[in-house]
Amino acid sequence: MGVLYYSTRGDKQAYTASQAILQGLAKDGGLFVPDALPKLDKTMEELSAMDYKEVAYEVMKQFLTDYTEEELKTCIKNAYNDRFDTPAIAPTVKKAGAYYLELFHGPTIAFKDMALSILPHLMVTAAKKNNCDKEIVILTATSGDTGKAAMAGFADVPGTRIVVFYPKGGVSAVQEKQMVTQKGKNVKVVGIHGNFDDAQSRVKALFGDKELEKELAEGGFQFSSANSINIGRLVPQVAYYAYAYANLLRDGELKDGELLNVVVPTGNFGNILAAYYAKNMGVPIGKLICASNDNKVLFDFFRSGSYDRNREFILTTSPSMDILISSNLERLIYRIAGDDSAVNAELMASLSKNGKYTITEKMAERLGDFYGNYANEDETAAQIKSVYESDGYVMDTHTAVASAVYEKYKAETGDTTKTLIASTASPYKFARSVMSAIDSKYENGEDFALIDELCRISGVKIPAAVEEIRSAAVLHNTVVDRDEMKQTVLEFLGL
């Protein structure tokens, strides 16, 4: 029997992987989780002889058991191709006393490409497998990176449309330019007056709107999600942690079975949850170090056992982590509750109603794999400058948060375990913040002048994703209030 998926909130209906990917969010508002976390059937030694596509297949076949070998391998081949600027797809580099897993070599230069390059292929295959005759409408909230990566993946894919909502004024200049210049007949980008949490909570509400679901069905449409709430986003991310470990083993940086700590800059909790899944599959991962910025709701949760979003929302230089409602944490809560959906549903209801919840002591004991800390704006900038000056390596703001938290972790624990840091975006995506951190003289430079200067000082070629927006025409300029999001979707679909 293959892996089946259930809601974290109690809906007892079982779904195959393809059905869960098509639906995105469970009908009761919960997230889909596998009935049991599968194990790898290959050793790390065996994986170390494989390329990225082969490792991805070995990991993903364990979760997506209703896809045939041919279907899954075709999806992988179509995703991880020459749209990535290195054959390694996700190379690991050794700098400043750690290993940086560079997840930004895809078409939109952020780690979201690792999953969103394959999600459209998984979804179109799922639609065929399930005889879905409706057009799939991808509805996505973005804190900056998901939106562009999702649009790049779904643009002009037959049988799909995509609507992306982003917080106007809450993303970097390059992130916004990437989105509003996106081509594709099936693509719509909308700024909202509000922050990412506003966008995400309204998108979730649209998913749960039964009246809207009926209206869409009558018009020949059905919703799905490209956010990390979709299990089809999460599963491909597990692969790169297995690949990184296997590469370090191949290169003699690790001995077989030696533990590797992993640091992940964290917002919506999907990327670090993928590392947790990799550890549970058998990848020898030690501590999972959760790095937050000034929006440190996760740091407080790991320290106190209480999750409380009732606080000021802070705009930082690491906007993809400017999040107070960390959606994927729900999958971990379900797990530490012993897969008890009633406990999880009660906590999520409390979060919805009161903006907070507290886990039991028994649940907290099951968080031993995790360590949480945060880096403020000054610490983040100082880390960018420090690593650049010591190693000539330029990192983006999110990676710098992780790097700074790693230094705090070592100072606090004395742990000398070798460590992998997830490098989640190209520094070119946040050139102003990166250059200002290196030298205050760059604070008032023009965006593309700073990009050119970053190229000069780093010796790293400007990515095609940045060059192509330099002179690209703005194609999307809609900005709406939160309450107008539903109407905006209906108008785009002609309903």
Role assignments for model-derived ranges:
Residues 1-495:
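PLP-dependent amino-acid enzyme catalytic core
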